[in-house]
């Protein structure tokens, strides 16, 4: 085997390893977690009384936002009709268009889990994380 053949073989092997490394790094970047850093919030000062049936509507509406926003163009509005005289819960969720569907869902799951700590029992709230946003109210918007 000549020196030039050995060089071409090493060069081809190096190129192949470089391409494989780039693919692996690219795949890792695609699987990165969404940015869930807190950005801002606006919480209604009125609180939902403990045991109020509005909580049931609100929880169902937030679950709907979490489940469907990523598959509805990253901007989804919904409502949950009041049962037993409870007010209807209205909501909207938005994810940055630059993130993946799975990152959108993950960001909203994170936000739904944190929203009560940010806007404790508020009848309306707007909370923004870096990659996603949720608004909910007792009135249509």
Swiss-Prot record:
Keyword Iron recorded: no
PROSITE patterns attached to this UniProt entry: GNK2
Highest rank taxon of the organism: Eukaryota
GO MF entries: D-mannose binding
Described function: Exerts antifungal activity through its carbohydrate-binding specificity.
Disulfide bridges in this chain: 43-119, 95-104, 107-132
Keyword tags: Antibiotic, Antimicrobial, Disulfide bond, Fungicide, Lectin, Mannose-binding, Plant defense, Signal
Ranges in coiled-coil conformation: none
Entry-linked InterPro entries: Cell2Cell_Antifungal, GNK2, GNK2_sf
Pfam families: Stress-antifung (PF01657)
UniProt signal peptide: 1-32
Positions bound to alpha-D-mannopyranose: 44, 126, 137
A single GO BP: killing of cells of another organism
Segments forming domain Gnk2-homologous: 36-141
Protein name (record): Antifungal protein ginkbilobin-like protein 1
């Amino acid at each position: 085997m000549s020196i030039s053949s050995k060089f071409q073989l090493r060069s081809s092997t190096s190129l192949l390893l470089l391409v494989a490394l780039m693919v692996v790094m690219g795949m890792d970047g695609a699987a990165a977690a969404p940015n869930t850093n807190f950005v801002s919030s606006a919480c209604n000062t009125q609180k939902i009384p403990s045991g109020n049936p509005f909580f049931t509507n609100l929880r169902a509406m937030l679950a709907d936002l979490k489940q469907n926003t990523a598959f509805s163009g990253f901007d989804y509005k919904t409502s949950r009709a009041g049962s037993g005289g409870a007010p209807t819960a209205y909501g909207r969720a938005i994810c940055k268009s630059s993130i993946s569907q799975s990152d959108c869902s993950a960001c909203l799951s994170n936000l739904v889990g944190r929203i009560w700590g940010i806007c404790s029992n508020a009848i309306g709230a707007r909370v923004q994380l870096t990659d996603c946003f949720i608004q909910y109210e007792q009135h249509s918007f």
